[in-house]
């Protein structure tokens, strides 16, 4: 049985429409964990799995507004897709780490206002083909996950510590 991530990859969608672009030539930033497996990118932000955490999805942001470069976004890839369906793209989800609830709500409104028909079509396609629904209360879900996260399984290159 294929994992949801494998099913997602087989859809061959234009990931840039949900800020989850597939990149062939990956530039490795200092904060990208050495034990990470890339899912997709939004500019320099890498979304990934990290080996000891199974299906948990992380953001790795070299230009973070928070006090950490790597942080969890979803317990599973299925939840990650549900968050994308709820928020329209990875962008609002990734920014929860430094936002309060009011900032997040305002950001979501702004994202919704500029969402294109092509983006809406991709979101509808994902929902139907993967058989998942938007996740309720994305802000609370992500904040709860981040508040109890043990990052001791994340491995960095020597460059990170320099």
PLM-predicted stretches and their roles:
Residues 1-65, 91-92, 98, 116-162:
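A surface-exposed partner-binding patch
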Residues 59-100:
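Compact, glycine/acidic-enriched structural inserts
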Residues 99-107, 115:
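Hydrophobic alpha-helical interaction segments
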């Amino acid at each position: 049985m294929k994992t949801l991530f494998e099913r997602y990859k087989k859809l061959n969608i234009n990931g840039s429409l949900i800020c989850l672009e597939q990149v062939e030539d990956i530039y490795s930033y200092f904060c990208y964990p050495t034990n990470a497996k890339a899912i997709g990118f939004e500019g320099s932000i890498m979304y990934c799995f990290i080996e000891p955490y199974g299906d948990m999805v992380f953001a790795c942001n070299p230009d973070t507004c928070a006090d950490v470069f790597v942080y969890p976004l979803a317990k599973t890839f299925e939840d990650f897709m549900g968050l994308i369906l709820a928020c329209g793209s990875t962008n609002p989800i990734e920014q929860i780490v430094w936002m309060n609830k009011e900032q997040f709500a305002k950001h979501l409104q702004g994202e919704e206002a500029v969402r294109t028909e092509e983006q809406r079509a991709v979101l509808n396609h994902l929902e139907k083909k993967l058989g998942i629904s938007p996740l309720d209360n994305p802000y609370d879900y992500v904040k709860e996950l981040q508040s109890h996260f043990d990052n001791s399984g994340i491995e960095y290159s020597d460059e990170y510590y320099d």
